[in-house]
Amino acid sequence: MIRLILHLFLFLFLSSYSCEAYRFSSSDQKVLNSFWKYAEEHRLGNLPVNERIPSIARFFLGTPYQSNTLNVTREELPVINLHELDCVTFVENVLALAFLEQYNQQSTEAFVQNIIRLRYRNAEIVDYTSRLHYSSDWLYEMQQAHLLTDITQFAGGIPYSKQICFMSEHSQKYPQLQKDSSLLKKIKTIETAINQRTYYYIPKDKINEACNKIKNGDIILITTHIKGLDTSHLGFAWKKEGKTYLLHASSKGKQVMI
């Protein structure tokens, strides 16, 4: 079991939005079909959302880890990949499934709608910069849309003062920004907006106290010392025998694990 290293955490709630064209493979459909059966067996539709989240997250235990699964199309599309996950897509997929009103084949489009609502600014896909690349930007936009409640400050958080500029200063790492200078300008504008906001984090010496306020299924964001970057990892809180663990897609473990 991996002990939790907590710096930021929050709880989400979601509603649906209109659907766009999306990429969905036969492998993903197989996973989704298995999930419909799992949802029926576990009566997920009868559970409140906060209890669905940890149950759905457990469904993905053992799913292989794979980074960079969203940048596989020339144009920005809501790519769906359920058979390979990184820490971000794991959280996205679990939440998108948790907020479905029903669990059957007819819910596929609603699932994609939820992905769009979680992944893109104002649930609109214009270009690469529509995607909420920075966790802090995602946090802000979800709150603005009244989809998320950030309890970090309430749990003893202090202001998180850091200049966010990783994408613009490392644009060579992002082919989309290299190909289109206008997108790089948009990213710089987004970074400027992020740096004008106030965010909070939980210092290491306050983690044990904060863990008492965490509930099973809450989302955890982990800050980073990397210059210009806000967070480096995220997952779900998993509570067991009074202790808090992280249920996440692990790059080191190469799978979804606790």
PLM-predicted stretches and their roles:
Residues A21-E92:
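Cationic-aromatic interfacial patches
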Residues S34-K37, P48-E51, L100, Y201, ...:
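Mature, folded catalytic cores of secreted/periplasmic enzymes
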Residues D205-I258:
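Accessory, usually C-terminal, subdomains that scaffold auxiliary metal cofactors
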Residues R197-K204:
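Short, structured beta-strand/loop micro-motifs enriched in basic residues and often containing a Trp
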Residues Y65-N195, K215, I222, K239, ...:
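Acidic/His-rich structured neighborhood in mature extracellular/periplasmic domains
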Residues Q29-E40, N50, P54, R58, ...:
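Generic detector of well-ordered alpha-helical segments enriched in charged/polar residues
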Residues M1-S26:
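Bacterial Sec-dependent N-terminal signal peptides
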